[in-house]
């Protein structure tokens, strides 16, 4: 499906926030999906993912969670700066940003306002989990990829698991040195205990960032399998 992309500006309590929007060229009404960035900004990878999602028949939006920063794009080679920047992200502010993106989707005439999903990677994986709880009335499907720190924070996203209403598909790599497998186990246990409908896939040969083909950690077989599962999951719950 052919897509068109653009940048829109959304209002937040801290000023304007850019968001990358991709949507099918063909008319009609489509589900909406919020794409939440890694700790490197709304870069070419995140824009590409947004456009790939749109090509499957969705209106996709990637809000710039770093809009409060002077540097909003960080190269993959500068992990210290990425970590320092993500540590300045305040959960409540990020939830406001994601809420603005959801509101934008719901306001569009070509979006099915009752069919909104969220997907995120790395930092965005954690925020996807949190958004499924914080925006539970709007989020109908959530897909966190290698969300580090879900068990961390005050309160942690994990502590809000009981608020989640949407089905969730979580992806991790067994060789992820940033997300210990005991954390993944805690997430699995809490989702099960709270009776959240979820699926989880752990790729034995994949590390952190395995889905991003611009990173050295890209693992093609795992990325392709996860993408097929993601497409099927969103189609099942949003279409």
Question: Which role does the model predict for each range below?
Answer:
Residues 1-239:
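N-terminal cap/leader regions of alpha/beta-hydrolase-fold enzymes
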